[in-house]
Regions:
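Amphipathic alpha-helical surface "interface" segments used
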Residues: 102-113, 128-143, 213-218
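Electrostatic cytochrome c docking/interface patches
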Residues: 15-37, 117-147, 163-164
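Inter-heme linker and motif-flanking segments adjacent to c-type heme-binding CXXCH motifs
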Residues: 52-53, 92-98, 116-125, 135-137, ...
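Periplasmic/extracellular electron-transfer cofactor-ligation site
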Residues: 29-63, 119, 145-183, 198-207, ...
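Short helix/loop segment immediately N-terminal to the Walker
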Residues: 35-41, 96, 126-128, 206-209, ...
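Extracytoplasmic electron-transfer domains, predominantly the class I c-type cytochrome c fold
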Residues: 19, 54-98, 109, 170-231
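N-terminal export/targeting leaders of redox proteins
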Residues: 1-32, 78, 83-86, 92-108, ...
Length: 231
Protein backbone atom coordinates (compact mmCIF):
# COMPACT_ATOMS: atom_id res chain seq x y z
CA UNK A 1 0.00 0.00 0.00
CA UNK A 2 2.02 2.92 -1.17
CA UNK A 3 -0.42 5.58 -2.12
CA UNK A 4 1.54 8.46 -0.61
CA UNK A 5 -0.36 10.75 1.69
CA UNK A 6 -3.30 8.42 2.10
CA UNK A 7 -2.53 7.10 5.58
CA UNK A 8 -5.91 8.13 6.90
CA UNK A 9 -7.70 6.14 4.23
CA UNK A 10 -5.98 2.97 5.38
CA UNK A 11 -7.99 3.10 8.59
CA UNK A 12 -11.13 2.02 6.78
CA UNK A 13 -9.56 -1.08 5.20
CA UNK A 14 -11.31 -4.27 6.20
CA UNK A 15 -14.67 -2.70 7.04
CA UNK A 16 -16.40 -3.83 3.83
CA UNK A 17 -17.34 -1.49 1.00
CA UNK A 18 -17.39 2.13 2.10
CA UNK A 19 -19.30 4.87 0.31
CA UNK A 20 -15.94 6.08 -1.00
CA UNK A 21 -15.14 2.61 -2.37
CA UNK A 22 -18.52 2.54 -4.08
CA UNK A 23 -17.84 5.92 -5.64
CA UNK A 24 -14.41 4.58 -6.61
CA UNK A 25 -16.05 1.61 -8.33
CA UNK A 26 -18.19 4.02 -10.34
CA UNK A 27 -15.13 6.00 -11.34
CA UNK A 28 -13.38 2.77 -12.32
CA UNK A 29 -16.06 2.20 -14.97
CA UNK A 30 -16.38 5.82 -16.09
CA UNK A 31 -14.43 7.26 -19.02
CA UNK A 32 -15.28 10.74 -17.68
CA UNK A 33 -12.66 10.19 -14.99
CA UNK A 34 -10.36 11.67 -17.64
CA UNK A 35 -10.93 15.31 -18.48
CA UNK A 36 -10.16 14.71 -22.16
CA UNK A 37 -13.16 14.92 -24.48
CA UNK A 38 -11.41 12.47 -26.82
CA UNK A 39 -11.10 9.75 -24.23
CA UNK A 40 -13.54 6.83 -24.38
CA UNK A 41 -11.62 4.44 -22.09
CA UNK A 42 -12.34 3.70 -18.46
CA UNK A 43 -10.17 1.55 -16.22
CA UNK A 44 -12.71 -1.24 -16.83
CA UNK A 45 -12.03 -1.09 -20.60
CA UNK A 46 -8.62 -2.66 -20.02
CA UNK A 47 -8.72 -4.32 -16.59
CA UNK A 48 -10.90 -7.02 -15.12
CA UNK A 49 -11.09 -7.21 -11.32
CA UNK A 50 -11.82 -10.94 -11.18
CA UNK A 51 -9.72 -13.40 -9.18
CA UNK A 52 -9.71 -15.87 -12.08
CA UNK A 53 -9.21 -14.86 -15.72
CA UNK A 54 -12.55 -14.21 -17.42
CA UNK A 55 -13.49 -16.52 -20.29
CA UNK A 56 -13.87 -15.21 -23.81
CA UNK A 57 -12.33 -11.83 -23.09
CA UNK A 58 -8.72 -10.68 -23.44
CA UNK A 59 -7.78 -7.52 -21.57
CA UNK A 60 -4.64 -5.53 -22.38
CA UNK A 61 -4.07 -4.94 -18.66
CA UNK A 62 -3.84 -7.43 -15.82
CA UNK A 63 -6.72 -8.17 -13.47
CA UNK A 64 -6.59 -5.71 -10.59
CA UNK A 65 -7.74 -8.28 -8.03
CA UNK A 66 -5.32 -7.84 -5.09
CA UNK A 67 -3.63 -4.93 -6.88
CA UNK A 68 -3.15 -2.86 -3.71
CA UNK A 69 -1.37 -5.81 -2.03
CA UNK A 70 1.33 -6.17 -4.70
CA UNK A 71 4.84 -4.98 -3.78
CA UNK A 72 5.34 -3.18 -7.10
CA UNK A 73 3.71 -2.77 -10.49
CA UNK A 74 4.42 -2.63 -14.22
CA UNK A 75 7.00 -5.40 -13.89
CA UNK A 76 8.89 -3.40 -11.25
CA UNK A 77 8.94 -0.11 -13.20
CA UNK A 78 6.54 1.46 -10.69
CA UNK A 79 6.93 1.24 -6.91
CA UNK A 80 4.06 3.57 -6.06
CA UNK A 81 0.48 2.51 -6.80
CA UNK A 82 -0.70 6.00 -7.72
CA UNK A 83 2.16 6.33 -10.21
CA UNK A 84 1.19 2.94 -11.69
CA UNK A 85 -2.40 4.20 -12.13
CA UNK A 86 -1.28 7.57 -13.46
CA UNK A 87 0.76 5.81 -16.10
CA UNK A 88 -2.50 4.47 -17.52
CA UNK A 89 -4.35 7.69 -16.85
CA UNK A 90 -1.94 9.86 -18.84
CA UNK A 91 -0.71 7.38 -21.48
CA UNK A 92 -4.03 5.76 -22.41
CA UNK A 93 -6.86 7.90 -21.05
CA UNK A 94 -5.38 11.17 -22.32
CA UNK A 95 -5.41 12.60 -18.80
CA UNK A 96 -3.38 15.81 -18.89
CA UNK A 97 -2.86 16.40 -15.18
CA UNK A 98 -1.95 13.24 -13.25
CA UNK A 99 -4.24 12.29 -10.36
CA UNK A 100 -2.93 13.65 -7.05
CA UNK A 101 -3.07 11.73 -3.76
CA UNK A 102 -5.44 14.15 -2.03
CA UNK A 103 -7.92 14.54 -4.91
CA UNK A 104 -11.27 13.07 -3.71
CA UNK A 105 -11.49 11.02 -6.92
CA UNK A 106 -8.05 9.49 -6.36
CA UNK A 107 -8.96 8.68 -2.78
CA UNK A 108 -12.19 6.98 -3.83
CA UNK A 109 -10.42 5.05 -6.57
CA UNK A 110 -7.79 3.99 -4.09
CA UNK A 111 -10.39 2.76 -1.62
CA UNK A 112 -12.03 0.77 -4.38
CA UNK A 113 -8.69 -0.81 -5.34
CA UNK A 114 -8.14 -1.70 -1.66
CA UNK A 115 -11.64 -3.19 -1.49
CA UNK A 116 -10.79 -5.58 -4.35
CA UNK A 117 -7.52 -6.57 -2.61
CA UNK A 118 -8.64 -9.06 0.04
CA UNK A 119 -5.19 -10.57 0.70
CA UNK A 120 -2.71 -8.68 2.91
CA UNK A 121 0.11 -9.53 0.50
CA UNK A 122 0.05 -10.65 -3.09
CA UNK A 123 2.88 -11.38 -5.51
CA UNK A 124 3.88 -8.88 -8.15
CA UNK A 125 2.53 -9.90 -11.55
CA UNK A 126 4.82 -10.74 -14.44
CA UNK A 127 4.85 -8.22 -17.26
CA UNK A 128 6.96 -9.17 -20.24
CA UNK A 129 7.35 -6.39 -22.73
CA UNK A 130 8.24 -7.48 -26.25
CA UNK A 131 10.75 -4.83 -27.19
CA UNK A 132 12.32 -6.24 -30.34
CA UNK A 133 9.71 -6.93 -32.95
CA UNK A 134 10.06 -10.15 -34.93
CA UNK A 135 7.60 -11.95 -37.15
CA UNK A 136 5.38 -14.65 -35.64
CA UNK A 137 4.18 -17.89 -37.26
CA UNK A 138 0.66 -17.57 -38.70
CA UNK A 139 -1.93 -19.72 -36.94
CA UNK A 140 -5.55 -20.66 -37.50
CA UNK A 141 -7.70 -17.91 -39.04
CA UNK A 142 -10.75 -19.26 -37.24
CA UNK A 143 -9.00 -18.92 -33.91
CA UNK A 144 -7.86 -15.47 -34.97
CA UNK A 145 -11.48 -14.38 -35.42
CA UNK A 146 -12.13 -15.39 -31.80
CA UNK A 147 -9.02 -13.52 -30.64
CA UNK A 148 -10.24 -10.43 -32.47
CA UNK A 149 -13.62 -10.56 -30.77
CA UNK A 150 -12.10 -11.18 -27.35
CA UNK A 151 -9.27 -8.66 -27.52
CA UNK A 152 -9.83 -5.93 -30.11
CA UNK A 153 -13.50 -5.60 -30.99
CA UNK A 154 -14.55 -3.54 -27.93
CA UNK A 155 -12.48 -0.64 -29.25
CA UNK A 156 -12.18 -1.34 -33.00
CA UNK A 157 -15.73 -2.55 -33.65
CA UNK A 158 -16.50 -5.33 -36.11
CA UNK A 159 -13.69 -6.35 -38.44
CA UNK A 160 -13.82 -4.71 -41.91
CA UNK A 161 -16.58 -2.22 -40.95
CA UNK A 162 -15.74 -0.89 -37.47
CA UNK A 163 -19.42 -1.24 -36.61
CA UNK A 164 -20.05 -0.61 -32.90
CA UNK A 165 -16.73 1.04 -32.08
CA UNK A 166 -17.05 3.67 -29.35
CA UNK A 167 -14.75 6.12 -31.14
CA UNK A 168 -13.67 6.61 -34.74
CA UNK A 169 -10.19 7.34 -33.41
CA UNK A 170 -9.74 3.56 -33.40
CA UNK A 171 -9.27 2.66 -37.09
CA UNK A 172 -11.04 -0.13 -38.97
CA UNK A 173 -9.07 -3.37 -38.92
CA UNK A 174 -7.43 -4.74 -40.93
CA UNK A 175 -8.10 -2.08 -43.60
CA UNK A 176 -5.82 0.43 -41.86
CA UNK A 177 -2.91 -1.79 -42.87
CA UNK A 178 -3.58 -1.17 -46.58
CA UNK A 179 -1.42 1.97 -46.40
CA UNK A 180 1.45 0.38 -44.56
CA UNK A 181 3.29 -0.50 -47.76
CA UNK A 182 3.48 3.22 -48.64
CA UNK A 183 3.98 4.54 -45.10
CA UNK A 184 6.65 1.98 -44.21
CA UNK A 185 8.33 0.97 -47.50
CA UNK A 186 10.32 -2.21 -47.31
CA UNK A 187 8.67 -3.40 -44.09
CA UNK A 188 6.11 -6.20 -44.26
CA UNK A 189 2.67 -4.85 -43.19
CA UNK A 190 2.33 -7.76 -40.76
CA UNK A 191 5.39 -6.53 -38.88
CA UNK A 192 4.00 -2.98 -38.57
CA UNK A 193 0.81 -4.52 -37.22
CA UNK A 194 2.73 -6.64 -34.71
CA UNK A 195 4.67 -3.59 -33.57
CA UNK A 196 1.45 -1.67 -32.90
CA UNK A 197 0.01 -4.48 -30.80
CA UNK A 198 3.23 -5.08 -28.85
CA UNK A 199 4.20 -1.42 -28.32
CA UNK A 200 0.87 0.43 -28.32
CA UNK A 201 2.02 4.03 -28.17
CA UNK A 202 5.55 3.39 -27.02
CA UNK A 203 8.99 3.03 -28.58
CA UNK A 204 8.33 5.64 -31.24
CA UNK A 205 4.76 4.57 -32.01
CA UNK A 206 2.07 7.23 -31.47
CA UNK A 207 -1.54 7.10 -30.28
CA UNK A 208 -3.14 5.97 -27.04
CA UNK A 209 -3.81 2.29 -27.68
CA UNK A 210 -2.61 0.00 -24.89
CA UNK A 211 0.31 -2.33 -25.49
CA UNK A 212 -0.04 -6.09 -25.10
CA UNK A 213 2.63 -7.82 -23.05
CA UNK A 214 3.22 -11.54 -23.61
CA UNK A 215 1.07 -12.34 -20.58
CA UNK A 216 -1.87 -10.48 -22.15
CA UNK A 217 -1.56 -11.87 -25.68
CA UNK A 218 0.64 -14.79 -26.72
CA UNK A 219 2.52 -14.91 -30.02
CA UNK A 220 0.25 -17.82 -30.88
CA UNK A 221 -2.87 -15.65 -30.51
CA UNK A 222 -1.18 -12.84 -32.41
CA UNK A 223 -0.23 -15.24 -35.21
CA UNK A 224 -3.83 -16.42 -35.42
CA UNK A 225 -5.03 -12.82 -35.62
CA UNK A 226 -2.62 -12.11 -38.49
CA UNK A 227 -3.84 -15.22 -40.32
CA UNK A 228 -7.44 -14.04 -39.89
CA UNK A 229 -6.49 -10.67 -41.36
CA UNK A 230 -4.34 -12.25 -44.11
CA UNK A 231 -1.43 -10.02 -43.11
C1 LIG B 1 -6.30 1.42 -22.53
C2 LIG B 1 -6.04 0.41 -21.56
C3 LIG B 1 -5.85 0.78 -20.11
C4 LIG B 1 -6.61 1.64 -19.36
C5 LIG B 1 -7.75 2.52 -19.81
C6 LIG B 1 -6.11 1.55 -18.02
N1 LIG B 1 -5.07 0.67 -17.97
FE1 LIG B 1 -4.03 0.15 -16.32
N2 LIG B 1 -2.75 -0.97 -17.49
C7 LIG B 1 -2.91 -1.20 -18.83
C8 LIG B 1 -1.79 -2.01 -19.30
C9 LIG B 1 -1.58 -2.51 -20.71
C10 LIG B 1 -0.98 -2.24 -18.19
C11 LIG B 1 0.34 -3.02 -18.18
C12 LIG B 1 0.04 -4.48 -17.94
C13 LIG B 1 -0.39 -4.64 -16.54
O1 LIG B 1 0.49 -4.60 -15.65
O2 LIG B 1 -1.60 -4.74 -16.28
C14 LIG B 1 -1.62 -1.58 -17.05
C15 LIG B 1 -1.15 -1.60 -15.75
C16 LIG B 1 -1.83 -1.12 -14.65
C17 LIG B 1 -1.42 -1.30 -13.28
C18 LIG B 1 -0.20 -2.08 -12.83
C19 LIG B 1 -0.62 -3.52 -12.53
C20 LIG B 1 0.54 -4.38 -12.07
O3 LIG B 1 0.37 -5.16 -11.12
O4 LIG B 1 1.62 -4.31 -12.68
C21 LIG B 1 -2.35 -0.69 -12.50
C22 LIG B 1 -2.34 -0.58 -10.99
C23 LIG B 1 -3.36 -0.14 -13.37
N3 LIG B 1 -3.00 -0.42 -14.67
C24 LIG B 1 -4.49 0.53 -12.95
C25 LIG B 1 -5.36 1.20 -13.81
C26 LIG B 1 -6.43 2.06 -13.35
C27 LIG B 1 -6.85 2.28 -11.91
C28 LIG B 1 -7.00 2.59 -14.47
C29 LIG B 1 -8.06 3.65 -14.56
C30 LIG B 1 -7.72 4.92 -13.96
C31 LIG B 1 -6.29 2.02 -15.62
N4 LIG B 1 -5.31 1.20 -15.17
C32 LIG B 1 -6.61 2.28 -16.94
C33 LIG B 1 -3.93 -0.75 -19.63
C34 LIG B 1 -4.88 0.17 -19.24
C1 LIG C 1 -8.68 0.00 -25.42
C2 LIG C 1 -9.01 0.17 -26.81
C3 LIG C 1 -8.21 -0.61 -27.82
C4 LIG C 1 -8.00 -1.96 -27.85
C5 LIG C 1 -8.48 -3.00 -26.86
C6 LIG C 1 -7.28 -2.23 -29.07
N1 LIG C 1 -7.04 -1.07 -29.74
FE1 LIG C 1 -5.99 -0.88 -31.46
N2 LIG C 1 -6.24 1.13 -31.42
C7 LIG C 1 -6.98 1.81 -30.49
C8 LIG C 1 -6.95 3.22 -30.78
C9 LIG C 1 -7.67 4.32 -29.99
C10 LIG C 1 -6.16 3.38 -31.94
C11 LIG C 1 -5.79 4.71 -32.62
C12 LIG C 1 -4.76 5.43 -31.80
C13 LIG C 1 -3.46 4.70 -31.80
O1 LIG C 1 -2.90 4.46 -32.90
O2 LIG C 1 -2.96 4.35 -30.73
C14 LIG C 1 -5.73 2.04 -32.31
C15 LIG C 1 -4.93 1.76 -33.40
C16 LIG C 1 -4.63 0.48 -33.86
C17 LIG C 1 -3.90 0.17 -35.06
C18 LIG C 1 -3.49 1.17 -36.12
C19 LIG C 1 -2.20 1.83 -35.97
C20 LIG C 1 -2.05 2.73 -37.19
O3 LIG C 1 -2.25 3.93 -37.06
O4 LIG C 1 -1.77 2.23 -38.26
C21 LIG C 1 -3.78 -1.18 -35.14
C22 LIG C 1 -3.09 -2.00 -36.22
C23 LIG C 1 -4.45 -1.72 -33.98
N3 LIG C 1 -4.96 -0.69 -33.22
C24 LIG C 1 -4.58 -3.07 -33.72
C25 LIG C 1 -5.22 -3.59 -32.60
C26 LIG C 1 -5.37 -5.00 -32.34
C27 LIG C 1 -4.89 -6.11 -33.26
C28 LIG C 1 -6.02 -5.13 -31.16
C29 LIG C 1 -6.38 -6.37 -30.40
C30 LIG C 1 -5.29 -7.28 -30.11
C31 LIG C 1 -6.28 -3.78 -30.67
N4 LIG C 1 -5.80 -2.89 -31.58
C32 LIG C 1 -6.91 -3.49 -29.47
C33 LIG C 1 -7.63 1.27 -29.39
C34 LIG C 1 -7.61 -0.06 -29.03
Amino acid sequence: MRWLGLGAVLLVVGCGPTPAAEYGEELFGDSKLSESQYNTFSCATCHSTAATPPQGKVYAGLSLHNVASRPHWWGGYETNLLDAVNFCYTAFMRGVTPLTPDDPKSRALYEYLVSISPDAQAPAQPFTLVKDITDVPRGSAEWGADVYRAACQDCHGEAHTGKGRPSKLAPILPEVAADYGVAFPGVAPGLVFIEKVRHGRFFGVGGNMPLYAREALSDKDLGALLAYFEL
